[in-house]
Structures are given as structure tokens and as C-alpha cells.
């Protein structure tokens, strides 16, 4: 049964690293002001940006990835240039380029009022990972197959799994898990900032 196989793989993919161990908390505290500043500029919960950064680099601003992906947000030089940002080896510029790209994806591809915020964020994450045009193609294929093109979970993600494999499905799921872990401890993560402001 294809649905049962999908469920087994889906459950296995939910096993992710805990982002709030001692090292994770220390790294988050160092980059938090930058994440908060740029998340606020694009009207995004900073914990979404933090969860994405944890997935991309385990909050390591010096990370280097495939295809020239660089820094905390694993931004490529081409993406940064397209967003009008240079020197992505610098933390501030890296996060700025990523935030601008996320805002661009949201505005140009996933602004429809038909999308609820949870689904919108899932599509934005998938597009950050694969590119927005590929995700839009998957939505069109979902529509052709009678699936809901405005729902990532259990709908468009099925098309993604068939066409590009489990990588993007695992990616979106992991970022969501990290976000939930951060969200659960939001009060503690933001307490230092509130204390410092007083």
C-alpha cells in the first residue's frame, strides 16, 4: 500500500536533531539579534528564520556548503546578487540576503489568500530549498492529479517525493520541527532580550 509506505517514511523523517542543546543555545544567542532584525523587516517570526538557519548550518556562520552556499543561511552568491546583497561571508549580509529571498519567494509565489500561514511557510521553505519555479510546477502537477495545490502536507509533498525524492520533504519537516522546539521555549529564548531592555 503506497499510503502505508508513505506514512512509514514520513514518520522516520520526523527524527531530527534537538536544536536547543547547550551548543545550540549558545550559537542561537550569538546570532539572535541579527535574525530578529531581518525577520522583523520582512514580517516573519524570527523563530522561523532561526529554525531555517539551524537546518542550513546548525547556526554556524562560518559554514560552507555545496555549490558555493555560504554562512549561517547557506546563501549562494547568485541568490545574494539577485537580492542586491554582497559579501555574504559577513553574518549580517548573509541573513539579509536570505531574508530578502524569503520575502521575494513569499511575495512573488505564495501570496495567495487561499494559503493558510502554516502551508504558506511550508511552500516557502520548499522553494528556498528547491527553487520557487520547481515548487510551482509541483503545485500544477498536484492540481492535474486532483490533489490540493494549496496544501503542502500530504498533497504537494507527495508530488515532491515522487519527482525529486524525500530530500525536500525531510527539509520542510525538519525546519518545522526546529521551529516547534524553538516556539515551545520562546519565553526563555526572548527573556534575555527583555531583561536587557529594562
Language model feature labels by segment:
Residues 2-198:
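Catalytic glycan-binding domains that act on GlcNAc-containing polysaccharides
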Amino acid at each position: 500500500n503506497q499510503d502505508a509506505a508513505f506514512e512509514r517514511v514520513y514518520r522516520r523523517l520526523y527524527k531530527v536533531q534537538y536544536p536547543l542543546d547547550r551548543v545550540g543555545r549558545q550559537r542561537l544567542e550569538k546570532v539572535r539579534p541579527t535574525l530578529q532584525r531581518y525577520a522583523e523587516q520582512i514580517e516573519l517570526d524570527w523563530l522561523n528564520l532561526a529554525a531555517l538557519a539551524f537546518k542550513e548550518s546548525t547556526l554556524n556562520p562560518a559554514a560552507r556548503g555545496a555549490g558555493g552556499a555560504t554562512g549561517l543561511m547557506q546563501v549562494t552568491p547568485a541568490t545574494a546578487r539577485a537580492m542586491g546583497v554582497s559579501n555574504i561571508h559577513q553574518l549580517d549580509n548573509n541573513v539579509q540576503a536570505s531574508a530578502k529571498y524569503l520575502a521575494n519567494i513569499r511575495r512573488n509565489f505564495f501570496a495567495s489568500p487561499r494559503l493558510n500561514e502554516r502551508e504558506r511557510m511550508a511552500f516557502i521553505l520548499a522553494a528556498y530549498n528547491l527553487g520557487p519555479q520547481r515548487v510551482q510546477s509541483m503545485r500544477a502537477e498536484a492540481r492535474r492529479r486532483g490533489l490540493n495545490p494549496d496544501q503542502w502536507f500530504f498533497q504537494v509533498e507527495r508530488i515532491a517525493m515522487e519527482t525529486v525524492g524525500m530530500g525536500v520533504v525531510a527539509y520542510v519537516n525538519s525546519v518545522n520541527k526546529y521551529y516547534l522546539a524553538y516556539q515551545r521555549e520562546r519565553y526563555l529564548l526572548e527573556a534575555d532580550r527583555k531583561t536587557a531592555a529594562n
